[in-house]
UniProtKB/Swiss-Prot annotation:
Keywords: Calcium, Cell adhesion, Cell membrane, Disulfide bond, Glycoprotein, Membrane, Repeat, Signal, Transmembrane, Transmembrane helix. It comes from Pan troglodytes. The lineage of its organism: Eukaryota, Metazoa, Chordata, Craniata, Vertebrata. Pfam families: Cadherin, Cadherin_2, Cadherin_C_2. GO terms for biological process: cell adhesion; homophilic cell adhesion via plasma membrane adhesion molecules; nervous system development. Residues 27-686 are extracellular. Its main location: membrane. Disulfide bonds join 96-102. Glycans are attached at residues 169, 359, 418, 436, 567. This is Protocadherin beta-14.
């Protein structure tokens, strides 16, 4: 990890070096302009676009702006014309004081790509200040014994202008004793000296009043005056003297007010009043007089107002010692202000972008500069931001930095970054400044809507009301704003036969699904379709999910009786021999239910019977069987009503009516099996032989049964009355008799049997076997069969 970190650091250093190299080449171009102070706001300075070789459109598109070193807006760049204009009146004397030339430094910053141009604006001085004297009156005491040619220092005037507009000369009002001399000065300042041109006589003139005039070099020149009061004293031949001409002290800028700075002491060899010395500042500026004070008796210099290294680094104080005779001496006190780390770094934001798109990399977030008013290590700074942020600082030139995104961001992971720019100096103790920037990551449509489930299963009970809400689908989008607004729709079904548009609809805003019409389980048990979720981004993104609708069965179908038919025609009659044993299968009620599940579970029960207890119905399969042995006392004709009920809630039911005819000596006939399929006819010879043998035995058995029945009926016809059955007048309908012995119609042979009366013979007529069907037989055919039955058996069936 340490090696990797070192490599990353080395890469960053190389990148910063290349950026600084490019910027240093781009920043070597500079422009120089000048303007007179006090020029009106909005005055033209220069056409910056022309001087920099840039088009006006380029200035606007690249967001050109002017940034000064002290972060003050002295100039304004008109992006429409490219003109550089004054944004405020400039006072050269306030900006630069006595410094000449007075040059203000600016940077022209262009973006896309980032480029800097240096601009220097020289503020030219105008003669807007007159020379002024700090003292309205200058008192000079001169002994009458002073020799001709003696010089006397006087307070100089102050002129805030510089150059030719500054103080140039002094004149004295006409008199017979003095003239003004301007000596050469190492600091090139003009100091007036009063020179004695003619000896004074205390007795003749003890006091002189002269006017000292200071004249500058402006056009027209300006001047200032002060009164010079000269008092003639008696002879004093020794002037005060200082041990050294220059005193140097170092004072930290945080020295408390009233603190002692230094003590300056002079000696005078005279005695008495001429030896008494008083100390004063002379040629002292207003800053010196405000900052320091001197004890006129002891010569102690004390601090009067706070020191600030960042404003003034040193003070040169001229101190004059004057004795009682008017003689004086001078020395210089040099006070050097020591810097302490009392100024935290300053952060100035030139431009800032608080919202950046998430898919943009290396986007400029902020351009800022840092400044520390201290000096040395106290003024050296380190600029940094937090670790583990996808941003980095890129130094440009001097103390300018750019805050740039390191890579493309992901708003869904983090939508906001709080970046703290920390600037720390290297002083003791270290001071730091923090500047917080909140960067909002604007959304880009990079996430498709996602359904909460890949598939949905909805349940809908049939016979629903139209427009019924059957369920909902839901999708979420990790984006924000319009990019996260989801619209739902139905996708074309994969099955072209599915009329999806007439079955369901979806609310485009919330994903609610509605059934458009009532559904029938018996027609449609289930269907599936796809729904889509599309956001409103550009380009729009979408996803889909599968919806499966299961139609739940409702108990809306009553049982339907397949057999016996209940179509309003003449009912079928089942023949039961009186010799039948208990449990004899009379018939089987077959019913179906169009519903499903427990709604289609059918149960059977005997609802009504002509003779209760004679017959019973099996509840689960509908088989009607005899419950006991039949006797001669039992009626020959019986009517049974069987109730068929489903297991729904509430249950639905149907009834089947059966007619049963008790017959003496009747037994189940035997008929050959139906012809086999063509494929079975090709069985081997052994199978054929077995079938032929079985058919022969069956025929013999059938013949015996028929003979037995015929004999039996002939005997009874004379001894007993003819049995009656409630067969309606008209044709006697055919019926189906189950002879399989298993009670299952699907595995039985069924024969159409017709019974007729009116004949003197008691016999049955069997017709050909038929395939089960539930169509009503032809009435004419039934009538013919009934007539044949009557003729054959001689029965009178009513």
């Amino acid at each position: 990890m340490e090696i990797r970190g070192a490599l990353d650091l080395r890469k960053r250093q190389v990148l910063i070096f290349l950026v600084l190299l490019g910027l240093s080449r781009a920043g070597t171009e500079s422009a120089h302009y000048s303007v007179a102070e006090e020029t009106e706001i909005g005055s033209f300075v220069a056409n910056l676009a022309r001087d920099l070789g840039l088009g006006v459109e380029e200035l606007s598109s690249r967001e050109a702006r002017v940034v000064s070193d002290d972060n003050k807006k002295y100039l304004h760049l008109d992006l429409l014309t490219g003109n550089l204009l004054l944004n405020e009146k400039l006072d050269r004397d306030e900006l630069c004081g006595s410094t000449e030339p007075c040059v203000l430094h600016f940077q022209v910053v262009l973006e896309n790509p980032l480029q800097f141009f240096r601009v220097e604006l020289r503020v030219k001085d105008i003669n807007d200040h007159s020379p002024t004297f700090l003292d309205k009156e200058i008192l000079i005491k001169i002994s009458e014994g002073t020799t001709v040619g003696a010089t006397f220092l006087m307070e100089s005037a102050q002129d805030l202008d510089v150059g030719s507009n500054s103080l140039q000369n002094y004149t004295i009002s006409p008199n017979s004793h003095f003239y003004i001399k301007i000596p050469d000065s190492s600091d090139r300042k003009i100091y007036p000296e009063l020179v004695l041109d003619r000896a004074l006589d205390y007795e003749q003139e003890a006091e002189l009043r002269l006017t000292l005039t200071a004249v500058d070099g402006g056009s027209p020149p300006k001047s200032g005056t002060t009164l010079v009061l000269i008092k003639v004293l008696d002879i004093n031949d020794n002037a005060p003297e200082f041990p050294q001409s220059l005193y140097e002290v170092q004072v930290p800028e945080d020295r408390p007010l009233g603190s002692w700075i230094a003590t300056i002491s002079a000696k005078d060899l005279d005695a008495g009043n001429y030896g008494k010395i008083s100390y004063t500042f002379f040629h002292a500026s207003e800053d010196i007089r405000k900052t320091f004070e001197i004890n006129p008796i002891s010569g102690e210099v004390n601090l009067r107002s706070p020191l600030d290294f960042e404003v003034i680094q040193s003070y040169t104080i001229n101190i004059q010692a004057t004795d009682g005779g008017g003689l004086s001496g001078k020395c210089t006190l040099l006070v050097k202000v020591m810097d302490i780390n009392d100024n935290p770094p300053e952060v100035t934001i030139s431009s800032i972008t608080k919202r950046i798109p998430e898919n943009a990399s290396e986007t400029l977030v902020a351009l800022f500069s840092i400044l520390d008013q201290d000096s040395g290590d106290n003024g050296r700074m380190i600029c940094s931001i937090q670790d583990n942020l996808p941003f980095f600082l890129k130094p440009t030139f001097k103390n300018f930095f750019t805050l740039v995104s390191e890579k493309a961001l992901d708003r869904e992971s983090q939508a906001e970054y709080n970046i703290t720019i920390t600037v720390t100096d290297l002083g003791t103790p270290r001071l730091k400044t923090e500047y917080n920037i909140t960067v909002l990551v604007s959304d880009v449509n990079d996430n498709a809507p996602a359904f909460t489930q890949t598939s949905y299963t909805l349940f809908l009970r049939e016979n629903n009301s139209p427009a019924l809400h059957i369920g909902s689908v839901s999708a979420t989008d990790r984006d924000s704003g319009t990019n996260a607004q989801v619209t739902y729709s139905l996708l074309p079904p994969q099955d072209p036969q599915l009329p999806l548009a007439s079955l369901v609809s979806i609310n485009a805003d919330n994903g609610h699904l509605f059934a458009l019409r009532s559904l029938d389980y018996e027609a449609l048990q289930e269907f599936e379709f796809r729904v889509g979720a599309t956001d409103r981004g550009s380009p729009a993104l979408s996803s889909e999910a599968l919806v499966r609708v299961l139609v739940l069965d409702a108990n809306d179908n009553s049982p339907f009786v397949l057999y016996p038919l209940q179509n309003g025609s003449a009912p079928c009659t089942e023949l039961v021999p009186r010799a039948a044993e208990p449990g004899y299968l009379v018939t089987k009620v077959v019913a179906v239910d169009g519903d499903s599940g427990q709604n289609a579970w059918l149960s059977y029960q005997l609802l009504k019977a002509t003779e209760p207890g004679l017959f019973g119905v099996w509840a689960h399969n509908g088989e009607v069987r005899t419950a006991r042995l039949l006797s001669e006392r039992d009626a020959a004709k019986h009517r049974l009503v069987v109730l068929v009920k489903d297991n729904g809630e509430p249950p639905r039911s149907a009834t089947a009516t059966l007619h049963v005819l008790l017959v003496d000596g009747f037994s189940q006939p035997y008929l050959p099996l139906p012809e086999a399929a063509p494929a079975q006819a090709q069985a081997d010879s052994l199978t054929v032989y077995l079938v032929v043998a079985l058919a022969s035995v069956s025929s013999l058995f059938l013949f015996s049964v028929l003979l037995f029945v015929a004999v039996r009926l002939c005997r009874r016809s004379r001894a007993a009355s003819v049995g009656r059955c409630s067969v309606p007048e008209g044709p006697f309908p055919g019926h189906l008799v189950d002879v399989s012995g298993t009670g299952t119609l699907s595995q039985s042979y069924q024969y159409e049997v017709c019974l007729t009366g009116g004949s003197g013979t008691n016999e049955f007529k069997f017709l050909k076997p038929i395939i089960p069907n539930f169509q009503v037989h032809d009435t004419g055919k039934n009538m013919g069969e009934i007539e044949n039955f009557r003729n054959s058996f001689g029965l009178n069936i009513q």
